[in-house]
């Protein structure tokens, strides 16, 4: 399934990272109990899907591998939040769609994108239009593959956090002896 998708679209796997549970757990305290959450870059074995369901949320998940492209598809069922980890290569398109949908959202992206001119310009325009960016910044560079992470990934949010910037403490960075991989990797080989 995933292998075919990458081949058909001439993509490389470096754009596909599976979020560890450690990062999913950080956002849960900011969500209203029993809410419905759309995870648009996820499969049934995604840590977002599994851990949000375990925490009592109803989860709608979709993935481009299944023909449900976030940029062109939206679930018919109503949802309260959009939460996921989108592909880095389409970050600006994802952010544009998220603000257009006008739903509270939280997506994981690297903090360095704030330095990208196109992203900075986009956030400035959103601010001028009354749309506020919020950040949930974790205090460690979290590893997605067990190796040392090269930059900090945090949540970019809108209409979700009680304050525009919140810092969160993590007990470890999910590398080496603390590494726990995402169960979504199971879906890659299917």
Language model: regions and residue ranges:
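Class I S-adenosyl-L-methionine-dependent methyltransferase catalytic core
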Residues: 1-190
